[in-house]
UniProtKB/Swiss-Prot annotation:
Pfam families named in the record: Acyltransferase, GPAT_C
Organism: Shewanella woodyi (strain ATCC 51908 / MS32)
GO biological process, one term: fatty acid metabolic process
Cell compartments where the protein resides: Cell inner membrane
Name of this protein: Glycerol-3-phosphate acyltransferase
Lineage: Bacteria, Pseudomonadati, Pseudomonadota, Gammaproteobacteria, Alteromonadales
Membrane topology: Peripheral membrane protein
Length: 807
């Protein structure tokens, strides 16, 4: 009888099963790690452990993986399914020699030497009983729950106290066939395999648990005694005419206000609460791209998460997802407005550090904050901050605030050698709890101060919020970014470390815009965002159900056949399923009559629904602009369409943070797809197939409000070429309000002054303003914009500008 079949062993497994709850990382190993189900598989574990193998055996069946107790049959010989690097640590005495375990690698290599067709996948498996990183000088806790090399007695204690927080992590497989063919099959290669595996397990543990945490007061004293803060304290004392003791005390107060106080115990409790909360709120959370971030952690990068900011839920969602994806929740830069009782202390112990909205002119606070941020980077803690500075009230990305990015870049310039990588993150929701509040704020209502009562009020309204979306975008490694932007930056900094480089501000601005572009590149298309995009382009926010389903199918084909980027995700299903989902979420309403079903957006939430539309409008804006060209011209050529897109794209890029590299190629692909779908026909030019005109008109409706804004701006520029930039912004905003009142435009962003400011800056960069404006270019773009508008809207704009001229 084998050991695992004995009554004693079965009893221990039964007891362990009652005590242990296992979380698997990644949740779908075959899919996420590209394991080949057709090839044999062997698990590699760091230490021989009956409890670890038992925990692994409980999950392998559900995942479609072979049991660790099931031997591998190779060429008629039985081989253990699990290979360990070292034996279990005994309660007393020395661990047994590793030679026995090394022989397992030798046997596998030998089998490949004898069988040229054999290709066994070595899959590293790491098990963690709890994820406490430990604290500096935390000797007592380390003695009781020493995690790296526990004896059987300590392992029993770990299972008893931390069994509900057991993580099993699978890693990318190694092909023994590749190793044998490339490096041979002798003992030297077996040693190399074992050595590489040990390094892998060591790095993996750091990814899962993070670096050790310093004692808070010890950290404060270390920071206060740093050279930069000593200088800042002396300068504060001199400038404010106070003693150095008082200045030092003020610096300590700032540190206490800013610094996080991370607690693994609170994180474990929060994990249980958040699991309940997400299950209560959402039907599921969709994640894309986590594996690349795990790899960056594994490779030793300092990771800084830069998500978009939709809701206060963002703080919780990203940390929760990272925890379940086998990464340490980051230290989060939170606005000081969230430091209210009791949430503030809880956020702080969950990893939040607090930042004032503005600290310009407060040199001591700036120095303290910068030194604290440097310390986080140096110690290897991942960090998260929101580059928008606040939550978007319109659903579009806000113009980035560059302060935190500048501080991060300065840390690199001061000599941080470890690669620092920004990870853009797109966060999306089928329902944002604050969206009704946002509309009130945009309408002029004063923003309420955050309090515990707001939290209770939100929790009282828990319901079916559909799905959540977390997409990790293309990472930006700062050393590589600097090498591209300023090839000789190292030499320049080394020659004069104290001098601020002249190129720093423009490089920071470029980096901030690249972050926002990469966030939008990772957008998630859902049933709510896509149905709102269609219905809000219709005249009464309503369509026949069959027409809506057909339009959604067209959009899905565009998004899947011409993917915006490889980081974008698109909802599964067809138009019919998306409409059903929207109805279930109560975002749409259904009215039936003898002629069929009509699906609409209720008037009371139509403005709120623009928020969800704006989340993904950038994905469909160019197809919409192409459709507008086709429907507003009886006949138009490919080159004419490309020219119009080329004129408008720089403005679209500026306001929507788009990153299309080749607009001409994209236009060609869109036109070819329209031909394939029998929406248009081509001879000497394009004409619309009469039976498909409604589909193209609906698609064109998405860009209509954007074109109206551009028409306002270029009509003003054409008639007032000497207009100052500030006047252009003010006049454009005034005419937009008039146009909205006359034509029923309710989208909040249409009246957003900041949007006109962004456009005016871009217009100056493009050479349209008076300093170097080209009248012929302005006239051409005005004609294009006017030509794509409905006649009534065009006339309102022309008449309004004429009235301004005669005023």
């Amino acid at each position: 009888m084998s050991k695992q079949d004995s009554l004693w062993f079965k009893s221990l497994r039964w007891l362990q099963k009652k005590l242990v709850h296992t979380i698997v990382v990644p949740q779908e190993p075959f899919k996420d790690l590209n394991l080949d189900p057709e090839k044999p598989l062997v698990y590699v574990m760091k230490t021989e452990s009956l409890s670890d193998i038992a925990a692994l055996s409980e999950i392998t069946g559900e995942l479609g993986l072979p049991s660790p107790y099931e031997p591998l049959e190779v060429e008629g010989r039985s081989t253990p399914r699990v290979v360990c690097l070292e034996g279990a640590k005994p309660l007393m005495g020395k661990r047994e020699s590793n030679e026995f375990f090394l022989s397992s690698f030798m046997d596998l290599l030998k089998a490949h030497k004898e069988s040229p067709d054999l290709d066994i996948q070595l899959v590293p498996v790491s098990l963690y009983w709890g994820r406490t990183p430990g604290k500096e000088d935390d000797t007592m806790k380390a003695a009781v729950l020493e995690r790296e090399n526990p004896t059987w007695l300590r392992k029993c204690l770990m299972i008893l106290f931390l069994g509900r927080h057991n993580f099993v992590q699978f890693s990318n497989s190694v092909s023994i066939r590749y190793m044998a063919d490339e490096h041979g099959t002798d003992k030297r290669i077996a040693h190399k395999l074992a050595r590489v595996a040990r390094v892998h397990f060591s790095r993996q543990r750091k990814v899962m648990t993070g670096p050790v945490l310093p004692k808070r007061q010890a950290l404060f004293h270390a920071l206060i005694n740093s050279e930069s803060l000593k200088r800042a304290i002396q300068e504060e004392a001199t400038s404010k005419k106070i003693s150095e003791v008082e200045a030092r005390a003020k610096a300590m107060e700032y540190l206490d206000e800013i610094a996080a106080d991370y607690s693994d115990s609170l994180v474990r409790i929060a994990e249980r609460f958040l699991t309940w909360l997400w299950n209560k709120l959402y039907k599921g959370i969709n994640i894309k791209g986590a594996e690349q971030i795990r790899q960056l952690h594994h490779d030793g990068h300092e990771i800084i998460y830069v998500p978009c900011h939709r809701s206060h839920m963002d703080y919780l969602l990203l940390s929760y997802i990272l925890y379940y994806q086998g990464m340490v929740p980051p230290h989060i830069a939170a606005g000081i407005n969230l430091n209210f009782w009791p949430a503030g202390p809880m956020f702080r112990r969950g990893g939040a550090f607090f930042i004032r909205r503005s600290f310009r002119g407060n040199k001591l606070y700036t120095a303290v904050f910068r030194e604290y941020l440097d310390q986080l980077f140096t110690k290897g803690y991942s960090v998260e901050y929101f580059t928008e500075g606040g939550r978007s009230r319109t659903g579009r990305l806000l113009a980035p605030k560059t302060g935190m990015i500048a501080m991060t870049l300065n840390s690199v310039l001061r000599g941080m050698e470890r690669p620092v990588t920004l990870v853009p993150v797109y966060l999306g929701y089928d329902h944002v709890m604050e969206v009704a509040t946002y509309h009130k704020e945009l309408s002029g209502k004063k923003k309420k101060k955050e309090s515990v009562w707001q939290v209770f009020g939100a929790l009282r309204k828990l319901g079916n919020f559909g799905q959540g979306y977390v997409n990790f975008g293309k990472p930006i490694t700062l050393h590589s970014f600097l090498n591209e932007q300023v090839p000789d930056w190292r030499e320049e900094i080394a020659s004069d470390p104290e001098q601020k480089p002249t190129w720093l501000t423009p490089v920071v601005n470029t980096l901030a815009n690249q972050v926002m572009t990469n966030i939008n590149d990772a957008a998630a298309v859902s049933s709510v965002t896509l149905t709102s995009l269609v219905l809000l382009a219709s005249e009464q926010n309503a369509l026949e159900r069959t027409q809506l389903e057909k339009q959604l199918d067209l959009y899905l084909k565009l998004l899947k056949d011409l993917p915006y980027t490889s980081y974008t995700s698109v909802v599964e299903g067809d138009g019919k399923q998306l409409v059903t989902q929207g109805l279930e979420l109560k975002k749409l309403q259904l009215d039936s009559d003898p002629l069929g079903d009509i699906v609409s957006i209720d008037e009371s939430i139509s403005i709120a629904m623009t928020y969800y539309r704006n989340n993904i409008i950038h994905l469909m804006i160019i197809p919409s602009l192409v459709a507008s060209c086709l429907t507003q011209h009886e006949r138009i050529t490919r080159d004419e369409i490309k020219a119009i897109i080329a004129d408008f794209y720089p403005l679209l890029e500026a306001e929507l943070f788009m990153g299309v590299e080749d607009t001409d190629k994209l236009v060609e692909q869109i036109l070819d797809l329209f031909i394939e779908q029998q929406l248009i026909r081509e001879d000497t030019g394009f004409s619309v197939v009469e039976t498909s005109i409604n589909q193209l008109l609906l698609l064109a409706g998405t860009v209509s409000e954007t074109l109206q804004r551009y028409a306002i701006i270029f009509n003003l520029l054409a008639d007032f070429p000497e207009m100052e930039r500030s006047d252009l912004e003010a006049e454009s905003h005034k005419l937009a309000k008039r146009l909205g009142a006359l034509h029923g435009i309710t989208a909040p962003e249409f009246y957003d002054k900041n949007l006109y400011r962004t456009l005016s800056v871009k217009l100056k960069d493009l050479g349209y303003l008076k300093d170097n404006g080209n009248k012929a270019d302005v006239e051409r773009v005005r004609a294009s914009a006017n030509g794509l508008l409905r006649s009534s809207v065009r006339q309102t704009i022309v008449d309004s500008v004429a009235a301004e001229r005669s005023a």
